[in-house]
Amino acid sequence: MGAAVTLNRIKIAPGIADIRDKYMELGFNYPEYNRAVKFAEESYTYYYETSPGEIKPKFCLIDGMSIDHCSSFIVPEFAKQYVLIHGEPCSSFKFRPGSLIYYQNEVTPEYIKDLKHATDYIASGQRCHFIKKDYLLGDSDSVAKCCSKTNTKHCPKIFNNNYKTEHCDDFMTGFCRNDPGNPNCLEWLRAKRKPAMSTYSDICSKHMDARYCSEFIRIIRPDYFTFGDTALYVFCNDHKGNRNCWCANYPKSNSGDKYLGPRVCWLHECTDESRDRKWLYYNQDVQRTRCKYVGCTINVNSLALKNSQAELTSNCTRTTSAVGDVHHPGEPVVKDKIKLPTWLGAAITLVVISVIFYFISIYSRPKIKTNDINVRRR
């Protein structure tokens, strides 16, 4: 019978490419069993990513070891941005805890498992593995810099995503109450987050005549028109004498609405195209596009009465506009320019030039000399 396989020699040799890598050369009494097991012992402190979005120190966390061993390999700044997850299975020498045995060539998890008494010297564990995850800022100054976009260089994504998430809502609510015309506040409002719309509804209920309230109304209509209607109602209820509010809160009078229809179709404060839409409730804004009439102004310079009859004539068709739902009240109106045929301008020019040349030719001709003829009648 042959002798049993015994381990005669163990030698640790350093790696070449990476100082963390080492080789454990195992010499047996039978040379065919000799092995060179490659392993690593982590010694770096990571301030960079080993691959996009993750850090994987060469450390095998075996049972009974604290996870603090993993976090000791990354700098404090990264510790705020990365979280530890369950890494891949690994093996480590018990007499060199944390060492990471490389699986390569004949050295596989199955090979180690089948070795007799292997568990006395080799332990199983999980490799330290960190992935990047957005994190919350710990101080108000950092939140202010990120949300106001004063300095976004080191801001986590959740605080630097054009206000798509709720993380800046608390800061922006207070910030924009003090400076509602700030471009960043208007960008926050354009994200159509309800805290932003509610904030501007409260602001415009006191300052509806401000320019930023025009943008507020444009943004919220039609989907969230109630925020604007509430602001207009409160403002006009507190400023009844403001002429801008006469369409939304007209002095009580039954005759106009009774005989002329909805006041949004005839009252100057409603129909004047130069007026801002923010002074109309949303339903008035829609109604104004559906008024079934053509309005005009009649100027009478003289009035002649004959047989108790008066006749007035006014051309109301020259300002005729389309009837019905012309456009959505949430979209700006673009007036079409009057297009004339291209040949018409050339024809008019040719006629004018011909007339000019005709008169020039007539007046440039020399006068015809004639003799005076005396005629006497008997």
From Swiss-Prot:
Ranges facing Intravirion side: 364-378
PTM notes: Most cysteines are linked by disulfide bonds. They are created by the viral disulfide bond formation pathway, a poxvirus-specific redox pathway that operates on the cytoplasmic side of the MV membranes.
Superkingdom field: Viruses
Subunit (UniProt): Part of a stable entry-fusion complex (EFC) which is at least composed of proteins OPG143, OPG147, OPG155, OPG086, OPG094, OPG107, OPG104, and OPG099. Formation of the viral membrane is necessary for the assembly of the complex. Interacts with OPG094. Interacts with OPG153.
UniProt entry tagged with the keyword Ribosomal protein: no
Location in or out of the cell: Virion membrane
Family membership: Belongs to the orthopoxvirus OPG143 family.
Bilayer-spanning residue ranges: 343-363
MF GO annotations: ATP binding; DNA binding; helicase activity; hydrolase activity
Lipidation (N-myristoyl glycine): 2
Entry function: Envelope protein part of the entry-fusion complex responsible for the virus membrane fusion with host cell membrane during virus entry. Also plays a role in cell-cell fusion (syncytium formation).
Main location: virion
Residue intervals annotated with topology Virion surface: 2-342
Protein name as annotated: Virion membrane protein OPG143
Keywords: ATP-binding, Disulfide bond, DNA-binding, Fusion of virus membrane with host membrane, Helicase, Hydrolase, Late protein, Lipoprotein, Membrane, Myristate, Nucleotide-binding, Phosphoprotein, Signal-anchor, Transcription, Transcription regulation, Transcription termination, Transmembrane, Transmembrane helix, Viral envelope protein, Viral penetration into host cytoplasm, Virion, Virus entry into host cell
Signal peptide: none
GO aspect biological process, one term: membrane fusion involved in viral entry into host cell
Membrane topology designation: Single-pass type II membrane protein
Induction: Expressed in the late phase of the viral replicative cycle.
Cellular component terms (Gene Ontology): membrane; viral envelope; virion membrane
